[in-house]
Amino acid sequence: MSWPATHDELEALGRELVAGGLGPFGGYEVAFGELSLTGPAHRIVEGLTLLRDDHGFQQLVDICGVDYPERERRFDVVYHLLSFTKNRRIRVKVQADEDTAVPSVTGVYPNADWYEREAFDMYGVFFDGHPDLRRILTDYGFHGHPLRKDFPMTGYVEVRYDDELKRVVYEPVKSVEWRNWDFLSPWEGVERGFAPILPGDEKGEEAKS
């Protein structure tokens, strides 16, 4: 296949890799000049090995997650691969839930080590066979997984350095009390030849009349 590949060539590669659903991939999509593959999570090691050894995708660029809370298997685990020789990228997606571990691909791409730790830290996705699956971005004892859709925007605790105690302290988040903000601008409507009457302007209007 010539690279960069045309849409039809990517379609042909997708059909070849899916192979009637008998291989490690169950579906494919071509969009924006890139091929995305989907498959069962338990065959991800087989699938990535095939792409590395038979199709020249030597580099794992990233592993990321997507959260769909309304889905039974709420997470997509997305693997981004790069071929140096063909100058092309390919994407592989598998689905996972909160209880079922995805096989680790550190045996295929050793740099998956930290990527899988990040996915575990941010989404709570477990990777079976990972050599050291622990948090990598959040602090020790952190509660929850920040990139889940149901994680609160403010988090659960505030972490700061207390200069008096000379140590890091954890405190419950102190949210701002609800307020009825007035966003009305006195300049709104000026370009149309009038301006709104703001609270407190009533006396001025009465004096004019």
Curated annotation (Swiss-Prot):
Name of a matching Pfam family? Complex1_30kDa
Gene Ontology CC: one annotated term: plasma membrane
Sorted alphabetically, which InterPro entries does this protein's record hold? NADH_DH_suC, NADH_quin_OxRdtase_su_C/D-like, NADH_UbQ_OxRdtase_30kDa_su, NADH_UbQ_OxRdtase_CS
- Report the domain of life of the source organism: Bacteria
Classify the protein's membrane topology as the record does.
Answer: Peripheral membrane protein
Quaternary assembly: NDH-1 is composed of 14 different subunits. Subunits NuoB, C, D, E, F, and G constitute the peripheral sector of the complex.
Protein name in UniProt: NADH-quinone oxidoreductase subunit C
